[in-house]
Each structure stands twice: as C-alpha cells, then as structure tokens.
C-alpha cells in the first residue's frame, strides 16, 4: 500500500498558474469580452464529437458524443441566471462589479468500470467498480478586468460517496485561473481558460486511488493519495459565427497531472489532451 500526504506539493504549480494567468490576461487587448448574452435572453443548442482520454491519466483514447445546451436569462435586479449542459446551473449575483459572485450547482457523472464510447465499451478499469454520480454545490468569485477575468471556484459533492468498498465522504475541489475571449474578427472568436485544480483527499481517492478491495480484483496496486494540487489545465476554443444564429466551434484541452495524481497506478500518461467540434444554433 502506498500513502502520500504532502501539503506543500502544490506550491510551485500554483505559482506557475498565477504567473501564467496574469501574463495571458495582460497580453490580450482591452476589448476582449466574456459575456455572450449581450443583456438579452438566449438559448443555444448544439452537438458534435469529442476525442479524449477515458479519464485523467489514461493512455486509452476514445471518441464520445459532444452535446451542448445553454440558456441565459439576464435580469435587472436579480443578476443573471444560466442553465447549461454539462456545466449545470449558475446564478451571478448583481451589483458587485468589477467583482462578482456566482452560486453553482453542478453534476459529477462519476466513473464506470466499463466506460461507454462511440466504439462500444472499454474494460480497462474492470474490477474497480462503479463510482456513483452526484450533484455538486459550490460558488465562484471573480474579478472582471478589461481584458479578461480571474476566478476561483469551489465545488463539493452534495452527499457522501462510496467507492471500492470504502466510504470516501464528500469529494471537493477548487479551481483558480483566468478566462479570456478575444475577437479575432467580426465572425471569429478565440476563447482561452488556464487554471489549476486542488482536490481534497476524498476527491483524489475517487479519481486516482485504489482501495484494498479494488487491488484484489485488478492488476493495480493499492494506493491512497493525499489531498493537494491535482493538475494544471489549458483550454483553447475557436468559434466561427457562420450565420447570425449558426456557429461552428472547435477546441482543445490539455492537462498536466501533478503531485500524487502523477504517481497513481491508474496514471499511464502524466500529460493528456482532447479535442472537440460542435455545430451550434442560437435562438
């Protein structure tokens, strides 16, 4: 059995993410904007295909359907309400500019030992058992700058979780970084998000741990990671507004695992990437 708990193991990645976030924010022009509602209600639906690892750290890649739903309702007195899939529900409270606070309700789909893909099912995690899905609750605080937005958001499972014959308690994680949107032309927009993720011990165990029961059923060694920095992630997206109501979007996501996540027996690749392509219709 391997157990790790190093509270200082995420210090240097955090400094990196803060420095990179500030550099990216200062590099973008002042007219970059993140709010796509334009003060009016909107509904966007779309779908396409996504390709990526089966889970963070996996060397097995597969194609998955990509679905996108987003409804935005700005109000004068109550802030802005957003419902999106797969992100969840968001309420941006009013009257705090240039700072902001948003209440969040999300969803963690868990992880199956047999993962469904467009090609069928992958049995790489057979014997690990299923991690049940759960609702997430949390909040985000952010600082809107002329050329981007710095944010910190935290989410926690709404119930205790069980995995591999053990009770994990409530899983929780914290993300901190910067998001920007840069209009390259009247029809082309470049979006970027750079952030680091910290997980509590329960969340790390759910994602990268191996219990004694799981070790007995699989080829993976027992492993109990500690809480700490989990990964650093960069997302880049390009949206082409083909018609006033029609758009195409594509992008990539790349991550680097750090700390105990790198050393998990479930981790085959410490750096991973994925891509997506969607067609969107906006009402």
Located regions from the model:
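Short glycine/proline- and aromatic-enriched beta-strand/turn motifs that initiate or cap beta-hairpins
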Residues: 31-84, 112
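Outer-envelope beta-barrel architecture signal
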Residues: 37-45, 63-65, 79, 95-101, ...
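Transmembrane beta-barrel strands of outer-membrane/channel proteins
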Residues: 43-51, 103-107, 152-156, 178, ...
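Residues on the lipid-exposed face of transmembrane beta-strands in outer-membrane beta-barrel proteins
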Residues: 47-51, 67-73, 87-91, 137-143, ...
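Predominantly the C-terminal beta-signal and adjacent terminal strand-loop region
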Residues: 56-57, 229, 234-283
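Outer-membrane pore/translocation modules
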Residues: 83-179, 184-186, 191, 203-226
């Amino acid at each position: 059995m391997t157990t790790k708990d190093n509270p200082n193991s995420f210090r240097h990645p955090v400094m990196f993410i803060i420095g990179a976030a500030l550099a990216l924010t200062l590099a973008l022009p002042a007219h970059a904007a993140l709010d796509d509602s334009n003060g009016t209600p909107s509904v966007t639906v779309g779908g396409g295909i996504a390709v990526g690892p089966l889970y963070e750290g996996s060397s097995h890649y597969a194609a998955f359907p990509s679905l996108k739903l987003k409804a935005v309702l700005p109000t004068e007195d109550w802030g802005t309400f957003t419902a999106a899939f797969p992100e969840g529900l968001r309420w941006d409270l009013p009257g705090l500019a240039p700072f902001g606070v948003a209440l969040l309700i999300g969803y963690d789909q868990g992880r199956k030992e047999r993962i469904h893909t467009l090609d069928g099912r992958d049995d790489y995690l057979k014997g690990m058992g299923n991690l049940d899905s759960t609702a997430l609750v949390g909040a985000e605080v952010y600082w809107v700058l002329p050329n981007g937005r710095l944010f910190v958001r935290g989410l926690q499972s709404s119930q205790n979780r069980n995995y591999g014959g053990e009770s994990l308690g409530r899983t929780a994680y914290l993300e901190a970084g910067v998001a920007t949107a840069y209009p390259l032309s009247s029809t082309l927009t470049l979006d970027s998000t750079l952030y680091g993720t910290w997980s509590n011990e329960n969340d790390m165990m759910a994602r990268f741990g191996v219990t004694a029961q799981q070790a007995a059923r699989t080829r993976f060694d027992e492993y109990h990671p500690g809480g700490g920095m989990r990964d650093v992630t960069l997302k880049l997206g390009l949206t082409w507004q083909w018609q006033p109501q029609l758009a195409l979007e594509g992008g990539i996501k790349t991550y680097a695992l750090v700390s105990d996540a790198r050393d998990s027996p479930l981790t085959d690749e410490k750096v991973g990437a994925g891509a997506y392509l969607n067609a969107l219709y906006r009402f």
